[in-house]
Amino acid sequence: MASLEGTKAPDFELEGSDGTKHAIRNYSGKTVVIYFYPKDNTPGCTKEACSFRELHQDLQKMGVVLLGVSKDSLKSHDKFIRDFGLPFVLLSDPEAKMMQDYGAFGEKVMYGKKAMGTIRSTVVVGPDGTVVKHWQTVKKAAEHPEAVVDFLRNR
């Protein structure tokens, strides 16, 4: 999939770990970071989530909303949040509809085999609803949140 940079962010409506429905249209006027990850409570995803946790106050000071998205259930998200003290909302996309719209679900190679799955990626949506940054394939999960914050600081 081509980069989404410069395009209107695809809308979505998903249930969040906070018990409410979330849609990109509800964040008009705010900068939103949406990061897509494969699975709660797995090594790479936990490192990425904990790195975002450590930087969450920096994001809040900049007025940035952070949302994590995976196919996991809300029950799984609740456990993940509790286990690691995550201070941000996780969205459940069990059918991968939003992930497909954002290029975060498709064919990937794991351990030499092709399979369909979540592609670790991140988008930054500006206050006008336009995607201003799109990391299409995140390779270093633990370091990636710092790159996101650096991008936002230097914008």
Regions found by a protein language model. Name each.
Residues M1-R155:
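Chalcogenol-based redox active-site neighborhoods
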